[in-house]
Every structure is written in C-alpha cells, then in structure tokens.
From Swiss-Prot:
Entry GO terms, CC: cytoplasm
Source organism per UniProt: Macaca fascicularis
InterPro entries noted in UniProt: LZTFL1 (IPR026157)
Regions annotated as coiled coil: 88-296
Localisation per UniProt entry: Cytoplasm
Main location: cytoplasm
Stated family: Belongs to the LZTFL1 family.
Summary of subunit composition and partner proteins: Self-associates. Interacts with BBS9; the interaction mediates the association of LZTL1 with the BBsome complex and regulates BBSome ciliary trafficking.
Keyword Coiled coil applies: yes
Biological role stated in the UniProt entry: Regulates ciliary localization of the BBSome complex. Together with the BBSome complex, controls SMO ciliary trafficking and contributes to the sonic hedgehog (SHH) pathway regulation. May play a role in neurite outgrowth. May have tumor suppressor function.
Name of protein: Leucine zipper transcription factor-like protein 1
Length: 299
C-alpha cells in the first residue's frame, strides 16, 4: 500500500482490521435503523399527533440513538486501545519504546487516503485474498534479517560477558586465597625463626644442632610450599590477564555491533532505545575494568 507506506504483510494486517471495523460499524448502523423502524411500527399509528406527543416520541428516539452511538464510540475506543496494546507489548519484547503522534489522527490528508484505500478495497474486483494464517510475533526493523542477527549477536555477547564476570570472580577468590595462604606461611616461618633465636641460649649444643637441622628442613619445606604458591599465583595472574583480554575482546565486539546497529537504525525511532542499551552495557564493562584494575599486580 504505497499511499500509506506499508509493506505487504502490514497491508494485510491493515485490511483485516479495516474489515473488522467496517463490520462492527455496519452492525451498529443496523441497530440505529431498527430504532427508527421500531418507532414507526409502535408509535406512528395515529394520523395526527399533538406537539407534546411529537416531543415525547422524539425525546424517546433521541435517548435510544444517543445510547447506541455512545456505546459504539466507547467500544471503538476500547478496541483501538487493545490493538495498540498488542503492538506495544511486541515492541517491549525487543526492548523498543514506540512513540505516537496524536495530532496525526486528525490529519485530513491521511484520513482521506485511508478512506480512498477503503473504497478501493471494497470496490476492487481483482483484489488478492487475505490468507488467514497464524501470525507470528512482530520482529521490528527486520529488514533482510540484519537487525535480528545483530540483536542475537548482542544477546550472545551479553551471555559471554556474564560468563567472563563469573570466571573473573572465581579467579579473584582464588588469588585472594593464595595470597592469604602465602602470608600465613611467611608469618609461620618468621615465628619459627624467632622462636629458634629465643631458645638458642637455653639448649645444649647437640639439641641446638638438631633444632637447626629441623628448622632447615622446615624452612626448605616452607620454601618449597611458598614456591608452589608463587607458581600458583603466577598462573592465577595469567588467567586474570586472559580474562581481561577476553573482556576487551567482548567490549570490541559490542562496540562493532553498536556501530552496525547505528548504521541500521539511523533515522528510526528505535535508534535512541538501542543506543541507550549499548551505553548501559559499555558502562557495565567500564565498571568491570575498574574492578579488574584493583586486582592487577603492582610493579
């Protein structure tokens, strides 16, 4: 429908709703006609009427017609609200915020275009049938599948980002535990050496020799343990660096996806919404980088 700027699928949706509205309008007009017909058959049986009788008949007819018209207007408004709710609900599933221009609802030019299209749709003898199929949920901005693929890629990157956060947290816990263990071993060695110095004047030479041998053995064992802990710490630091590189890669991919979306969504109402989502994700990544910097080894 070139005159209203809709594609074939949305044209079919529009025609279905237009037919529904026309059917409801026809039923209500028949109801109004029946009000007049009932009046003719039930009240207009006399040849002459007084002014009071005519006023009474017209007042009764006015009340009935007023009630019917009011009911139809209310029902039409509620129907439009339900239709709008469907569109908004589908948009929210794609993290979009739709905007409406109420002033366009009174645009005479557009209203005339709608009327002309309805007239052409009614009178056209070669119009294509509208297939009644099960309709999938709307996929906004799905031009050639590019935007949908970008959205899927963003979701994948978000999942990978969460996995990296979890992995980073585990590495941080392991690194903290290793540092604590190393500190405990160093303190135990210092305490043992201090205790050895305090007891040298109170033991015999033989006992001192044995104690020194024992201390040497313990020191060697402690040193070996410390070396193992140091190697473990280096491994944890390497894992931490790897996690940081992975995080930077994810950030770069998110940045590339953002640029691609900007090219795709520019000049659309959804551009600002997707930009806001990517900005939040970048802020989360910046916060994560700050947290990573706190656990990087100092020179």
């Amino acid at each position: 429908m070139a005159e209203l700027g809709l594609n074939e699928h949305h044209q079919n949706e529009y025609i279905n709703y237009m037919r529904f509205a026309r059917s409801k309008r026809g039923l209500r007009l028949k109801t109004v006609d029946s009000c007049f017909q009932d009046l003719k058959e039930s009240r207009l049986v006399e040849e002459t009427f007084t002014i009071d009788e005519v006023s009474e008949v017209l007042n009764g007819l006015q009340a009935v017609v007023h009630s019917e018209v009011e009911s139809e207007l209310i029902n039409t408004a509620y129907t439009n609200v339900l239709l709008l709710r469907q569109l908004l609900a589908q948009a929210e599933k794609w993290y979009l915020k739709l905007q409406t221009d109420i002033s366009e609802l009174e645009n005479r030019e557009l209203l005339e275009q709608v009327a002309e299209f309805e007239k052409a749709e009614i009178t056209s003898s070669n119009k294509k049938p509208i297939l009644d199929i099960t309709k999938p949920k709307l996929a906004p901005l799905n031009e050639g599948g590019t935007a949908e693929l970008l959205n899927k890629e963003i979701l994948r990157l978000q999942e990978e980002n969460e996995k990296l956060k979890s992995r980073l947290k585990t590495i941080e816990i392991q690194a903290t535990s290793a540092l604590d263990e190393k500190s405990k071993l160093e303190k135990a060695l210092q305490d043992l050496q201090l205790d050895q110095g305090n007891q040298k004047d109170f033991i015999k030479a033989q006992d001192l020799s044995n104690l020194e041998n024992t201390v040497a053995a313990l020191k060697s064992e402690f040193q070996k343990t410390l070396n193992d802990k140091t190697e473990n710490q280096k491994s944890l630091e390497e894992n931490l660096a790897t996690a940081k590189h992975d995080l930077l890669r994810v950030q770069e991919q998110l940045h590339m996806a953002e640029k691609e979306l900007e090219k795709k969504f520019q000049q659309t109402a959804a551009y600002r919404n997707m930009k806001e989502i990517l900005t939040k994700k970048n802020d989360q990544i910046k916060d994560l980088r700050k947290r990573l910097a706190q656990y990087e080894p100092e020179d």
